[in-house]
């Protein structure tokens, strides 16, 4: 399968419509039937898909409309977790932090229904399914059962592996593991790497790994050891500085973050064009995907949309220049290709 050179994608989350946030609150209070909530989620999913498509994104997602939060969604569906209540993250942001109180088991699909709905309702051939990785789920949960972190993380890796196999069996072609916490503790990075490799064991489709706001020089030491097709990393927030760690990236793709998801300022098309060309100092264009730094959910929806629009406009400008050199397409690589 071939894609246009410099395929554009998203990382995962997107601002939820205000009416969907109200539905989440009503559901939490037990004031609406579950079928009404599900209908609202599906409507929001289609609305966000259309925004991504209208912006021109090649490989969209629905902005995680089905998910209340990136770890809570998964821990709520994995047997062995228990919720005690909300935990403050920063400012006025809270999430329900789960505790492992028994052996963790895969009791039901985690995102299968979500994927099938998105695939049915998109006009694009490929969608990217983001899934929170095993190390981050463990890092952002309490452990009240396992004797050590390793056994906790590796049981989660086995559960994620079952979900990836379920998705692959149902036609998913591109999955992204989100591991924003994997570099929190340098001495535990080998454990995170082992967990990622266990999670993708037996998987043949395309798998990306998203890591953000971390020491990428530490990650670069493991580029060759991590069995993924692509590393989706943030660069706009760090103003595209200190990128020499990319010299260690070979034989795998880079998802190049070109818009800052923590800054409401909308990057200009020219700024994004210059950023993309800077990446060419490290990788050939055929090994680059273009995406935001991270999930866009913390931004105003109109700002998030315009950032995507400008990202796509910039890519189209660079594509035209590359096409003059006879470089118009890129291969859709999978784990079988690395």
Swiss-Prot record:
Cofactor binding summary note: Binds 1 zinc ion per subunit.
Keyword terms of this UniProt record: Amino-acid biosynthesis, Metal-binding, Methionine biosynthesis, Methyltransferase, Transferase, Zinc
Pathway given in the UniProt record: Amino-acid biosynthesis; L-methionine biosynthesis via de novo pathway
Primary enzyme class: transferase
CDD domains noted in UniProt: CIMS_C_terminal_like
Entry EC no(s): 2.1.1.-
Cofactor(s) recorded in Swiss-Prot or TrEMBL: Zn(2+)
InterPro entries: Met_Synth_C/arc (IPR002629), MetE_arc (IPR022921), UROD/MetE-like_sf (IPR038071)
Domain of life: Archaea
Record Gene3D superfamilies: 3.20.20.210
Any GO BP: methylation
Binding site for Zn(2+): 210, 212, 234, 294
UniProt-listed SUPFAM superfamilies: UROD/MetE-like
Name of a matching Pfam family: Meth_synt_2
GO molecular function per UniProt: 5-methyltetrahydropteroyltriglutamate-homocysteine S-methyltransferase activity; zinc ion binding
Function: Catalyzes the transfer of a methyl group to L-homocysteine resulting in methionine formation. The physiological methyl donor is unknown.
Family, similarity comment: Belongs to the archaeal MetE family.
Name listed for the protein in its UniProt record: Methionine synthase
Protein's organism: Pyrococcus abyssi (strain GE5 / Orsay)
Lineage: Archaea, Methanobacteriati, Methanobacteriota, Thermococci, Thermococcales
């Amino acid at each position: 399968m071939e894609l246009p050179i410099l395929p554009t994608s998203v990382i995962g989350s997107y601002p939820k419509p205000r009416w969907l946030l109200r539905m989440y609150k009503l559901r939490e209070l037990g004031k609406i039937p579950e079928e009404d909530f599900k209908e609202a989620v599906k409507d929001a999913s289609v609305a966000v898909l259309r925004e991504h498509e209208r912006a021109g994104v090649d490989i969209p997602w629905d902005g995680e409309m089905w998910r209340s939060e990136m770890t809570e969604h998964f821990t709520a569906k994995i047997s062995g977790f228990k919720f005690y209540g909300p935990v403050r993250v920063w400012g006025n942001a809270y999430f329900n932090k789960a505790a492992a109180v028994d052996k963790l088991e895969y009791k039901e699909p985690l995102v299968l229904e979500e994927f099938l709905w998105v695939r049915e309702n998109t006009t694009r051939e490929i969608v990217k399914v983001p899934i929170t990785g095993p190390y981050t789920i463990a890092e952002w949960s309490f452990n009240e059962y396992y004797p050590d972190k390793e056994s906790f993380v590796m049981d989660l890796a086995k559960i994620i592996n079952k979900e990836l196999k379920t998705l692959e069996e149902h036609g998913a072609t591109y999955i992204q593991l989100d591991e924003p916490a994997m570099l929190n503790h340098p001495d535990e990075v080998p454990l995170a790497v082992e967990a990622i490799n266990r999670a993708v064991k037996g998987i043949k489709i395309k798998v990306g790994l998203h890591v953000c706001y971390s020491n990428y020089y530490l990650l670069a030491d493991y580029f060759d050891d991590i069995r993924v097709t692509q590393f989706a990393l943030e660069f706009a927030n760090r103003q595209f500085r200190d990128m020499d760690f990319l010299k260690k990236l070979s034989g795998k793709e880079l998802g190049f973050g070109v818009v800052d998801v923590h800054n409401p300022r909308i990057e200009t098309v020219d700024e994004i064009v210059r950023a993309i060309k800077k990446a060419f100092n490290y990788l050939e264009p055929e090994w680059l995907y273009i995406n935001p730094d991270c999930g866009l959910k913390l931004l105003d929806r109109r700002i998030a949309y315009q950032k995507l629009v400008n990202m796509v406009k910039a890519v189209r400008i660079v594509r035209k220049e590359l096409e003059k050199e006879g470089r118009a397409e890129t291969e859709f690589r999978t784990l079988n290709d690395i």
